[in-house]
Amino acid sequence: MQNQNASLTGLQMLQDEMGRQHKDALSSFHLAEPIAVEIAASLKNTGRLMLLGMGASHWVNRIVEPAYRAAGIDATAQVISEYLRAPIAGKPMTQILTSQSGGSGEIIRYLDDTPDHTHFFGLTLDSNSPLAQRLPSLIGAGGVEKAFAATRSILISLALHAAVLEKLGLPQDQLLAALSNPVECDDAEAVELLAKSKCIIFSGRNLLQGVADAGSLCLMELGRIPTLSLEGGQFRHGPFEVLKPGIGVILLAPVEDESDSVKRLASECVAAGMRPVLFDLRGGEAPEGCVTISLPNRPGMGGAAEAVVAMQAALVKAAALMVPEVGTPLRSSKVTNGE
């Protein structure tokens, strides 16, 4: 496998990861049950969850943070490098440390600096990693992610969290349906538009804001352009002043009632002379002037999974038009130590 990966381009490695992510995520969900039961029991005991990670792992945590709150858990997602410097004191809490490689420098330092690992759990794609060896861990199926930017690892991580959420009483039928029935979107117009942008703003609501955050990181890594991710309300409170030709806008509209506010935001972007790309889970009438990508009508984690897959497909295609040798990093590595 190592020799095979060495012969693949960065783009081919990304495509390989995305091509098997639904199957691996579905397997991950079903294989996670024993540890998911343990984590759910811990959460019922503490009532408090700290989600810690770096890079795309942190943005996965941001996606699922509202879902845990909906399950009655006091959940917070924090960048672990920040948490190392300003930990939250107080009552006991369950902690899930996420690292697709299981070897992130910040994760290792945190485990070294924190002697008591009661109510600590890991989430990783590598069963032989330091994280998996030191903590009871949710393990993703299919092995570690080889491509530079996170694609498959995001969907697998969502599936692993979904296994825990189901044990907390939140049914995951919609997520399982999304994983069992992959959908290909007609994104050609959106890809062409995004590939011409010099900077792109991402925005969503609720779980889809974490999806927007993950997309923003993905395009910085692959397209090598500046991006900014702002929750819908934050985007409207001042940053609208940056809108001008050359800036792209990506909006994500959920099934839930928040969809109306996202579509109003899309209309306001059009009025400002923009042509936003709208990933729409709700359906109905799309705002005029948008490039709309219609997705299956799924709420909650199912909707997040649909949005993740559709957005990453469009972003990888756009990035391939922006830079040569897309997916081959110039200044970064897959496993990083910022400490």
Regions found by a protein language model. Give the residues of each.
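Active-site phosphate/pyrophosphate-binding segments
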Residues: 10-48, 137-250, 258-259, 321-339
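Glycine-rich phosphate-binding loops that contact phosphosugars or nucleotide phosphates
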Residues: 44-186, 205, 240, 245-298, ...
